[in-house]
C-alpha cells in the first residue's frame, strides 16, 4: 500500500506507512467487486430514522438511511465513495428510490407506520434518473407519491440543473423538498433562496449545544422567523439531549430528529405516550415563557 501511495504522489518524496490513510483508502482497491455484487443483488436495506412533529408530539415521517449488507463496507459513505470512483452513482440513485420506497410500502402494508407519515429520501445531488426509471418509480408507488420528501444537499459538487429538475418532478407528483444540512458551511442562505424548500433541516453542528450557546440559539430563532415568512417548516437535526430539545422548542422549530428519541432502525420507531407528553409539556412551557416575555 505504501508503494502504491508513493507512486501516485510527488516524485522523489519519501512516504511512511499511514494506518489511518490505509484504513480509509484500501477499500478503494478492494471494494469494487463487492460493490458490484451489492448492486447486482440489490443487497441494500434501509433503516428508518424517526422525525417528530413538535405540534402533535407524534411521528411526522422517517428518513430512509442506506445500509449495504456487506462486511466490506462498514459505513454507507465508504460504499458511496467506491461507487463514485467506479462511475456507479446512477445505479445507487436508482436503487435508493426503488428499495427505500419498497421498504416504506411494506411497512405501510404491515401497519408499522402511522397513516400519513412522510418518507424522506436522500438523493445524490449530482445524479438524476432517466425518464424510464422515473416512470417506473411513479407506477410502483402511485399511492404514496405525496408522502415523499426529497432531501437535497446544496454543495460544491451538486449539479444545480439536476437539483432543480428533481424539484420540478417532486412538485408535479405532489411531494415535498427538504434542504439538508442547512448551516453546515456551503452557501446555505443562497440555497434557501434559490431552492425554496418546503422543509429546512438545520445541521447538527448548530443544534449541538444550542442550550449552552446563545449564538447558536439566536441562529435557530432567526431561521425559524425567516422560514415562517416562506411557509417553510424547520427541522432540528441531531437532537441528543433534553436540554437541546427544550431549547429548539423554545426557538420555535416545527420538526425534531435525533438520538434523543431513538436511533435509525429496521423496525420503525413509534412515539411513546411519555415521549409525546414530554414534547407537548415543553411546548406549553415555552408558550408560557413567551407570554411572560422570558424568552
Predicted regions and their residues:
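Catalytic core of bacterial c-di-GMP phosphodiesterases, primarily the EAL and HD-GYP domains
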Residues: 14, 90-164, 238
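Charged helix-capping and loop-helix junction motifs
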Residues: 30, 134-137, 164-165, 214-221
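Surface-exposed amphipathic alpha-helices with a cationic face
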Residues: 105, 142, 164-174, 221-228, ...
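Aromatic/hydrophobic pocket-lining residues that form π-stacking "cages" and hydrophobic walls in ligand
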Residues: 2, 100, 223
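EAL-family c-di-GMP phosphodiesterase catalytic domain
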Residues: 19-23, 53-58, 68-72, 124-127, ...
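Short beta-strand edge/capping elements of PAS-family sensory modules
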Residues: 60-63, 147
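C-di-GMP signaling machinery
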Residues: 1-47, 55, 74, 82-89, ...
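Cytosolic catalytic headpiece of P-type ATPases
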Residues: 64, 75-78
Amino acid at each position: 500500500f505504501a508503494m502504491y501511495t508513493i507512486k501516485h504522489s510527488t516524485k522523489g518524496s519519501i512516504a511512511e506507512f499511514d494506518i489511518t490513510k490505509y484504513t480509509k483508502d484500501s477499500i478503494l482497491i478492494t471494494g469494487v467487486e463487492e460493490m458490484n455484487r451489492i448492486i447486482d443483488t440489490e443487497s441494500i436495506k434501509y433503516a428508518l430514522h424517526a422525525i417528530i412533529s413538535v405540534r402533535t408530539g407524534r411521528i411526522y415521517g422517517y428518513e430512509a438511511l442506506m445500509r449495504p449488507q456487506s462486511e466490506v463496507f462498514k459505513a454507507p459513505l465508504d460504499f458511496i465513495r467506491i461507487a463514485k470512483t467506479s462511475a456507479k452513482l446512477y445505479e445507487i440513485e436508482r436503487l435508493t428510490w426503488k428499495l427505500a420506497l419498497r421498504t416504506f410500502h411494506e411497512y405501510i402494508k404491515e401497519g408499522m407506520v402511522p397513516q400519513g407519515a412522510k418518507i424522506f429520501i436522500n438523493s445524490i445531488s449530482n445524479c438524476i434518473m432517466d425518464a424510464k426509471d422515473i416512470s417506473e418509480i411513479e407506477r410502483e408507488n402511485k399511492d404514496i407519491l405525496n408522502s415523499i420528501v426529497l432531501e437535497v444537499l446544496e454543495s460544491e459538487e451538486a449539479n444545480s440543473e439536476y437539483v432543480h429538475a428533481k424539484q420540478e418532478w417532486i412538485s408535479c407528483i405532489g411531494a415535498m423538498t427538504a434542504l439538508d444540512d442547512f448551516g453546515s458551511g456551503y452557501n446555505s442562505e443562497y440555497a434557501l433562496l434559490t431552492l425554496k424548500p418546503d422543509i429546512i433541516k438545520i445541521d447538527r453542528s448548530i443544534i449541538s449545544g444550542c442550550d449552552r450557546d446563545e449564538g447558536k440559539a439566536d441562529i435557530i430563532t432567526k431561521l425559524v422567523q425567516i422560514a415562517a415568512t416562506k411557509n417553510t417548516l424547520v427541522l432540528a437535526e441531531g437532537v441528543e439531549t433534553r436540554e437541546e430539545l427544550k431549547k429548539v422548542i423554545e426557538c420555535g422549530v416545527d420538526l425534531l430528529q435525533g438520538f434523543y428519541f431513538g436511533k435509525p432502525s429496521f423496525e420503525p420507531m413509534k412515539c411513546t405516550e411519555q415521549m409525546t407528553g414530554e414534547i407537548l409539556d415543553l411546548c406549553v412551557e415555552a408558550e408560557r415563557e413567551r407570554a411572560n416575555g422570558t424568552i
